[in-house]
Each structure stands twice: as structure tokens, then as C-alpha cells.
């Protein structure tokens, strides 16, 4: 600061302004949050309110990250950039084949090709549990996830727990007793189907099941982990390993 450094931690937002004070709390290695107040929260009659946000460090300075809110995403492994998906057979998209054997296609006007839909493939999927795997993202239904806050399930510092389901279905990501990752046909609200999602200090995310079947209490140790290029599992969180880190990409 003496030499002209410094960076704004947080400015005004669409519905709040006047950020003040800064309280840093270290949850875990690479997991930090800050408390502050808004002088005026427009959703709360313009009153001063307390707020909590993750801390992201950039060039040695803390800046406010974003509390995860859910939505439709593909879930990217920081390790290789591959996507979390269902272990199902790959189904080709419906389109007219192109190649040297069909040269007159070049005389036809170009037209958009529709994305593959859930209805085109869901009947090819098993009806019971389907394990998860990691593979290159191809914008297919078995790679598209809806992440939804479950306010009635409790939470952790900064957020409620979330359910993670295949978009357009009730099929839910779940932890297993042997510390693996599967999907169950329908979300039931069981603790192993609830997920803690936190932004890390480098901007990536940690994803942890609320509970692991057969283990007592709330899980505070094991996270979704990329054990290899194609194998998601549950393992002890390690901030120094990209295997513990994920990104959320809107589609």
C-alpha cells in the first residue's frame, strides 16, 4: 500500500451498495470466506445487512468471489478439462452424413443441426443406479446437470446444500458407502445426495457430499476427486492437487 498498491475487495452490486468492514475466516486450506456489510441492501428496504462471500486471491490481493447459486452446467475437472457424466453408451446425433461420397451437399444451403435431446437418449439409459465417469465434453444430455439449492436441508458457512441432477430428470448424484460416486434414479433428499459447493481461493470449486453412507456425522474431509482422466471418486480434499478442484460451465 505504501508504494501505490491495493485492489478493491468488493464494489457495489445490482441490488446492494456500500460494502464495509472486512473479516477473514479460514475454513480449510484454500477455502476462505469474508464477512462484510452492505450499507444498503435494496431487497431489505435499503437496510444495512451482514453478508458472507468466498475470498479469491489475485496477484496477492483478496477479492470477493461469488456465492454459488446453482443453475444448469456441465461440471469440468480442473485436472484435464473433462466433464462429469453418466456412464452410458454414446449415441450419435441425428444428421445427414457428409463426405466425398455425397458431393452434391455442397450445392445445398447450410442449416443448423439440432442438439441431441434428452428424449432421444433417455430410454437407452439403465433404469437403476448409473455410475459417474469423466470424459470429454460433447454437449450431450448425460453431461448436462441442474444444480439446485435445498434450503430445508441445512447448510454451511455461506450457502445451503445443493442437489445435483441430470438436467430434465430427477436422477441425482450421490456418494456411496465405498467412497465412490454414482447416480440414483430419483432424488430422495438423503444426505449422501446433498452437496457442499465452495469457491476456492484460486477461483475453482470444491464439491463435497454432506454425508457418506456408513460414516457418522457431517462429512468434512472427502470431496469429489478426479482419480484419473476418466474416474471420479471420493478422496481426502487436497488444495495442492487439481484432482480436488472443479469448474462450472454454463451451457
Could you tell me what each predicted segment is?
Residues 1-15, 29-72, 181-184, 227, ...:
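Beta-rich carbohydrate-recognition and catalytic domains
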Residues 3-5, 19, 47-52, 140-142, ...:
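Short edge beta-strand segments in beta-sheet-rich domains
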Residues 8-13, 21-22, 41, 207-213:
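Short, glycine/charged-rich beta-strand-loop motifs at protein surfaces that mediate ligand recognition
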Residues 20-23, 222:
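Beta-propeller and closely related beta-sheet repeat lectin domains
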Residues 25, 31-40, 76, 163-164, ...:
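Hydrophobic core segments of beta-strands in well-ordered, beta-rich domains
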Residues 26-28, 199-200:
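Extracellular/periplasmic catalytic domains that process cell-envelope and extracellular macromolecules
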Residues 70-251:
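Lectin-like carbohydrate-binding module/patch detector with strong preference for beta-trefoil
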Amino acid at each position: 500500500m505504501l508504494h501505490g498498491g491495493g485492489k478493491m475487495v468488493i464494489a457495489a452490486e445490482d441490488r446492494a451498495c456500500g460494502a464495509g468492514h472486512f473479516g477473514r475466516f479460514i475454513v480449510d486450506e484454500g477455502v476462505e470466506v469474508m464477512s462484510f456489510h452492505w450499507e444498503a441492501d435494496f431487497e431489505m428496504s435499503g437496510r444495512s445487512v451482514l453478508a458472507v462471500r468466498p475470498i479469491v486471491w489475485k496477484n496477492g490481493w483478496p477479492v470477493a468471489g461469488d456465492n454459488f447459486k446453482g443453475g444448469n452446467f456441465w461440471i469440468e475437472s480442473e485436472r484435464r478439462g473433462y466433464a462429469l457424466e453418466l456412464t452410458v453408451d454414446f449415441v450419435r446425433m441425428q444428421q445427414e452424413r457428409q463426405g466425398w461420397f455425397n458431393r452434391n451437399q455442397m450445392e445445398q444451403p447450410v442449416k443448423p443441426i439440432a442438439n441431441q435431446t434428452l428424449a432421444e437418449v433417455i430410454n437407452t439409459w439403465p433404469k437403476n443406479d448409473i455410475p459417474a465417469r469423466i470424459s470429454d465434453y460433447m454437449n450431450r444430455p448425460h453431461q448436462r446437470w441442474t444444480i439446485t439449492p435445498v434450503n430445508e436441508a441445512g447448510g454451511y458457512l455461506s450457502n445451503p446444500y445443493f442437489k445435483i441432477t441430470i438436467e430434465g430428470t430427477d436422477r441425482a448424484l450421490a456418494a456411496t458407502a465405498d467412497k465412490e460416486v454414482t447416480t440414483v434414479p430419483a432424488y430422495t433428499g438423503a444426505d449422501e445426495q446433498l452437496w457442499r459447493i465452495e469457491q476456492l481461493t484460486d477461483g475453482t470449486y470444491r464439491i463435497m457430499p454432506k454425508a457418506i453412507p456408513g460414516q457418522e456425522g457431517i462429512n468434512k474431509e472427502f470431496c469429489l476427486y478426479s482419480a484419473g482422466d476418466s474416474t471420479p471418486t471420493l478422496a481426502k480434499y487436497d488444495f495442492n492437487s487439481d484432482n480436488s478442484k472443479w469448474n462450472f460451465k454454463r451451457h
